[in-house]
Amino acid sequence: METQKLISMVKEALEKYQYPLTAKNIKVVIQKEHNVILPTGSINSILYSNPELFEKIDKTNTIYPPLWIRKN
């Protein structure tokens, strides 16, 4: 999968869900909504290389309710 497409998927996930997302949450959302399998570390490498996106993710170890409970 090309990097630009993956970046746009990450942006879409961050815009769609109003609650804080971790890198793992983003990976799960993208895999479920786009029916793709992402390589390990692909989301992290995108986030770390893009400061604009990295600032938007939750970097704490807070446990949030499962996605199906908090979906808008």
Swiss-Prot record:
It comes from the Viruses. Keywords: Early protein, Virion. Induction: Expressed in the early phase of the viral replicative cycle. One of its GO terms (cellular component) is virion component. The lineage of its organism: Viruses, Varidnaviria, Bamfordvirae, Nucleocytoviricota, Pokkesviricetes. It is found in: Virion. Its main location: virion. It comes from African swine fever virus (isolate Tick/South Africa/Pretoriuskop Pr4/1996) (ASFV). This is Uncharacterized protein I73R. Belongs to the asfivirus I73R family.
